[in-house]
Curated annotation (Swiss-Prot):
The keyword Secreted does not apply. InterPro entries: GAIN_B, GAIN_dom_sf, GPCR_2-like_7TM, GPCR_2_secretin-like, GPR1/GPR3/GPR5, GPS. Its main location: membrane. GO terms for cellular component: plasma membrane. It is a multi-pass membrane protein. Residues 268-284, 341-351, 435-453, 501-524 are cytoplasmic. The record marks 222-223 as: Cleavage. Expressed at least in kidney, heart, brain and spleen. It comes from Mus musculus (Mouse). This is Adhesion G-protein coupled receptor G5. Residues 185-235 are annotated as: GPS. Residues 24-246, 306-319, 373-413, 477-480 are extracellular. The Stachel sequence (also named stalk) in the C-terminal part of the extracellular domain (ECD) functions as a tethered agonist. In the inactivated receptor, the Stachel sequence (also named stalk) is embedded in the GAIN-B domain, where it adopts a beta-strand conformation. On activation, the Stachel moves into the 7 transmembrane region and adopts a twisted hook-shaped configuration that forms contacts within the receptor, leading to coupling of a G-alpha protein, which activates signaling.
């Protein structure tokens, strides 16, 4: 090569390097600009992201791929052909990726380039991947929580990719268990919101959880993907864990002792044929079972315990809770019959039918769940919020319980809400009747006060305290946690006090009747 030709080649090479450096510099500046807080409108967020996409698709570089990295954004560019065999990307193999972050991966099928190569065979196709490790650019109207705050995006050339036969697989991992959380794979749908430049949508995506720490998304298109995390209620502050556990342990222990004493007093009672008293005893028995299984549930999640044992205990705990709630409703129904003056109406095998409902119906529900999907029971994680020093935002506390959020919503919250609502209606109706009785009297008799206290005490003890479970949010969270824990852990003790007061009243009434009979016999 002559000196002039060599000089020309050198100048061309130098110019190409200068262009490449300027291109990379512009891309890094734009990526760093995206890391800064911006407005919510389309003109700010969408414009910056689309600008980055276009620059990556048109960037000039040597080799087959390009990787750019800033603090919270990573951009990848790949040169593909129509003979694309597929591509697997993993954060563990990508360069310049912080090992502190939770891992992620994307897998593209060979079908990806078929749509672009149907009518023509372009010499080069560009696949770009933009990974956002911050979610501030993709905030929707609901301010949704994203797993790890990861948003992983991909785009093929300047054309949309939809309805793939073999989906794109996107894997998200977390360094803590995700059991007990509702996770769903979503994509960013532009123009789906009036107040933001888009919204999260699950269309075209299928969610799978291969393990407790991994979420696998199968999506039939290319766009920006994330995993929504939906917690059932506000997370419990971690610093309250110890006092709440202590209150629960002490309260349940007291209730267990009180329930055993109640059974002992009932065994010694002379008035064992009374249906109302027997209903009390069935409720007491279900509460005793509930307290015992609750105390055991946290111990059975230890690594040394077999998993089937935890599953069985979770099913028994759920059965005990449903049975307790059912017997609370039965108590309310029995009170309704008593105050409605229809208690003396003969109901054939009344107590047997109530037992079939109180013990049999919950057993049927639990058995159906076990037959349909036994995995709904097992080690479950309770959400605890904590400081952000480790970057996770929550920690895990396990117990043997229901793992399915849908089952928990229907057969715990829904079942308990229906029971509480029924007893609240009975309470309001009973108070209305007592107010009418008082209005007929010129002066309030002590019996009116006793009846009011009886109805209030009985109905409050029959499940109305469970309505506190529906106030676990906002400013109500802290008082609700302690009130709910105190009242419901001591539920067996309150039943014991109620039984003692009723027994004392019955004994006094029986004694008065005997004295009246004796005095009548003496006068004759």
């Amino acid at each position: 090569m002559d000196p002039h030709g060599a000089l020309f080649f050198y100048l061309c090479l130098l110019a190409a390097q200068v262009v490449l450096v300027e291109t990379l510099s512009d891309l890094l500046v734009l990526m760093k600009r995206l890391e800064q807080p911006v407005g919510r409108g389309l003109s700010s967020r969408a414009r910056h992201i689309h600008s980055l996409e276009q620059k990556l698709l048109n960037a000039s570089f040597g080799g087959h791929n390009l990787t750019l990295q800033t603090n919270s954004i990573q951009s990848l560019v790949f040169k593909l052909s129509c003979d694309f065999p597929g591509l697997s990307l993993s954060s563990t193999t990508l360069t310049n990726v912080s090992q502190v972050r939770a891992p992620h991966a994307m897998q593209f099928p060979a079908e990806l380039t078929k749509g672009a190569c149907v009518t023509s065979r372009p010499a080069e196709l560009r696949l770009i991947c933009i990974y956002f490790f911050t979610a501030h650019l993709f905030q929707d109207d609901r301010n949704s929580s994203l797993l790890n705050n990861y948003v992983l995006g991909a785009q093929l050339d300047h054309r949309p990719v939809n309805n793939l036969q073999k989906p794109v697989n996107i894997s998200f991992w977390h360094n803590r268990s995700l059991e007990g959380y509702t996770v769903s794979c979503v994509f960013w749908k532009e123009g789906a919101s009036k107040s933001s430049w888009g919204a999260w949508s699950p269309e075209g995506c299928y969610t799978e959880q291969p393990s407790a720490t991994q979420v696998l998304c199968h999506c039939n298109h290319l766009t920006y993907f994330a995993v929504l995390m939906q917690l059932s209620g506000d997370p419990v502050p971690a610093e309250l864990q110890v006092p709440l556990e202590y209150i629960s342990f002490v309260g349940c222990s007291i209730s267990i002792v009180a329930s055993l004493l109640t059974i002992l007093l009932y065994a010694q009672s002379r008035k064992q044929s009374d249906s109302t008293t027997r209903i009390h005893m069935n409720l007491n028995g279900s509460v005793l079972l509930l307290n015992v299984t609750f105390l055991l549930s946290s111990q059975m999640t230890l690594p040394t315990m077999p998993r089937p044992v935890c599953k069985v205990l979770a099913a028994v705990l759920h059965y005990a809770l449903l049975s307790s709630l059912t017997w609370m409703a039965i108590e309310g129904f029995n009170l309704y019959l008593f105050l409605g003056r229809v208690y003396n109406a003969y109901i054939r095998r009344y107590l047997l039918k109530l037992c079939m409902l109180g013990w049999g119906f919950p057993a049927l529900l639990v058995l159906l769940l076990l037959m349909i999907k036994s995995s709904v029971y097992g080690p479950c994680v309770t959400s605890l919020s904590k400081s952000q020093e480790n970057g996770t935002g929550f920690q895990n506390v396990s117990m043997c319980w229901i793992r399915s959020p849908m089952v928990h919503s229907i057969l715990v919250m829904g079942y308990g809400g229906f029971t509480s609502l029924f007893n609240l209606v009975v309470l309001a109706w009973a108070l209305w009747i007592l107010c009418r009785l008082r209005a007929r009297e010129k002066a309030l008799s002590p019996w009116a006060y006793r009846d009011t206290a009886m109805v209030l005490g009985l109905t409050v003890l029959l499940g109305t305290t469970w309505t506190l479970a529906f106030f676990s949010f906002g400013v109500f969270l802290l008082p609700q946690l302690f009130l709910f824990t105190i009242f419901n852990s001591l539920y067996g003790f309150f039943l014991f006090l109620w039984f003692c007061s009723q027994k004392r009243y019955s004994d006094a009434e029986a004694k008065a009747e005997m004295e009246a009979v004796s005095s009548s016999q003496m006068t004759h």
